[in-house]
Amino acid sequence: MFTYSAFDAERRAPEGPKGSQIVESFEERGAFSRDRARVLHSAALRRLADKTQVVGPRDGDTPRTRLTHSLEVAQISRGIGEALGLDPDLCEMAGLTHDIGHPPYGHNGENALNEVARGGFEGNAQTLRILTRLEPKKLVDATSYGLNLTRAALDAACKYPLTRTNPDGSTNRKYGAYDEDAAILAWLREGHTDAAPPMEAQVMDCSDDIAYSVHDVEDGIVSGRITLKVLWDLVELAALAEKGAKAFGGSADELIDAAARLRALPSIGAAADFDYTLASWASLKKLTSELVGRYVGAVATATMQAECNHPEQLRCDDNPSGALGRRFGSLVIPAEAEAEVRLLKTVAVLYVMDMPAHLRRQDRQRDRIFRVYDYMLAGAPGTLDTMFQQWWTMASTDAERERVVVDQIASMTESRLERAAKKAAGVAGFMA
């Protein structure tokens, strides 16, 4: 079990003990348990219930949303973390936060906002901004510290510990902090000697891939967009493997071999015959449970074996036990498990996200975001919520004011964005 220090539990704004306890009661929770609770009770997390995962939140009876996906990632993260001796609350919290910065319409909305945002838009960087600025919890002399999470918690939530712009002026496609948040990133990364994310963030990222690949395929099967019979269609499978290797890395042969291993699982064969009967629903749920357990077990076992084989690589003055944790150690994902996850992700992308109807819907979604951005920027601060009006007033440059509008739109649910788009269209029609 890794021993976390007072340095790991430090918060940007110091906090004393709570003063509202009933007489003779006391606070038993640790710092990371409090971090987890703050995220769990946040409005930003609740808003994910009305944000797209693969199919929209209103497609079908029980589709996954960004919120349910985040809960599943959090559970998987906790399981892997416990197996590796990491703090389970910290790992679970990282899973809860991993999509909290996503705007309406998921990656499609992310791309649209990136087109209009001076300084770029990235869901992971927006996560840090929400946790450290936008989600109201801790205010000191009119300065917002967001949820005021611990150093280790913010570090665990940051899987891309980079700013958008590098010292040489080049830019990163994926990054965990906007340039204006560089000081916050430096604070949470203090003590790191390389550019790798901490163990807890690695666990979160892996858990996201597992949940995404398994559960999104499950949703695709239920919606009728996916059938696992494709794993037996060698012609279709070959084309699928080529596209998957191009999109997610590795080779087509690795994905074809992964399909062969999956075909050998009885639960895959049962789920391939899904027909909405009670037995089919049970078979599908058995499959998702088995696959999650298959990949969690593979990752945990491989990582622990690597630690046992080379404990001296982790042992130092700051980590005398040589345990895995924070900046000590790397997650090991076996090649076979990684290939199977890539194959399942490919199935989800090609048979759900790249369907013509889905692509046409994405075009309409982008148009809404552009329309709302133009409307809110033109009428700001009056078009902004009260809290964002305050951010607007405090902004000193056009770029900062534009960022406030982007923050407002990114915080919206999809339902609210669509109402705002209708309002913006009405105003445009009136002005024409």
Which ranges hold each PLM region?
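Acidic, carboxylate-rich catalytic segments that either coordinate divalent cations
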Residues: 1-22, 366-379, 390-432
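Sequence-structural signature of the catalytic-core scaffold of metal-dependent phosphohydrolases
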Residues: 1-23, 27, 40-46, 75-78, ...
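Glycine/alanine-rich phosphate-binding loops at beta-alpha junctions
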Residues: 15-68
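Alpha-helical scaffolds flanking conserved acidic
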Residues: 33-34, 84-97, 147-157, 200-201, ...
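Intrinsically disordered or highly flexible coil/loop and linker segments, enriched in small
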Residues: 45-49, 86, 136, 140, ...
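Alpha-helical phosphate/pyrophosphate-handling elements in metalloenzyme active cores
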Residues: 59-90
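Secondary-structure capping and boundary motifs in well-ordered enzyme cores
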Residues: 62-69, 89, 101-105, 119-123, ...
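C-terminal subdomains that position terminal phosphate/3'-OH groups for nucleotidyl transfer/ligation
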Residues: 248-400, 412, 432
